[in-house]
């Protein structure tokens, strides 16, 4: 999007990290170390971070499905990718080049891709809009699907109408 904004009608950034503080960096590094040692525990912990307890209780099949998808991941490749995620540093000069109507969203209760991160990201992308998904965690696109889809659809429709 920073190189080819002219090719886009709009951009949606959902559940993204931005400018982790030192505590947040330690937390994701710790998650990496746990994932290296204890695969099942890290998957269950991740799902509880991504979905509310109430949703998990009411939707055990969805929980099982997502867990089984995580189980199918190649563990060595997951660790390699997660190391990149842990060590990622934001490039503000690149981000500031984004010049398209941008919607930035995250769940109200997302502890990894926090509302504060999303708000701060929206401050450096010219003309962007931030929307916090009420009661959402990291997988609010599943748990709060109707809300997320309406927000996305309205944003896309508005921006497609302008072209």
Q: Which positions does each model-derived feature cover?
A:
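Conserved alpha/beta-hydrolase "acid-adjacent" motif
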Residues: 111-117
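Hydrophobic "lid"/C-terminal helical patch
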Residues: 46, 82, 121, 148, ...
């Amino acid at each position: 999007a920073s190189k080819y904004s002219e090719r886009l009608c709009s951009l949606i950034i959902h559940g993204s990290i931005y400018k982790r503080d030192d505590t947040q960096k330690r937390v994701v590094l710790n998650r990496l170390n746990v994932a290296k040692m204890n695969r099942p525990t890290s998957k269950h912990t991740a799902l509880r971070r991504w979905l509310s307890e109430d949703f998990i209780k009411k939707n055990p099949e969805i929980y099982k499905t997502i867990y089984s998808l995580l189980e199918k991941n190649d563990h060595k490749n997951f660790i390699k990718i997660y190391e990149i995620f842990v060590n990622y540093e934001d490039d503000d000069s690149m981000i500031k080049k984004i010049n398209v109507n941008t919607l930035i969203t995250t769940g109200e209760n997302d502890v990894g891709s926090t509302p504060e991160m999303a708000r701060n990201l929206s401050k450096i992308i010219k003309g962007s809009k931030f929307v916090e998904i009420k009661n959402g965690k990291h997988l609010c696109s599943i748990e709060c699907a109707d809300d997320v889809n309406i927000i996305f659809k309205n944003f896309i429709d508005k921006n497609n109408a302008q072209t």
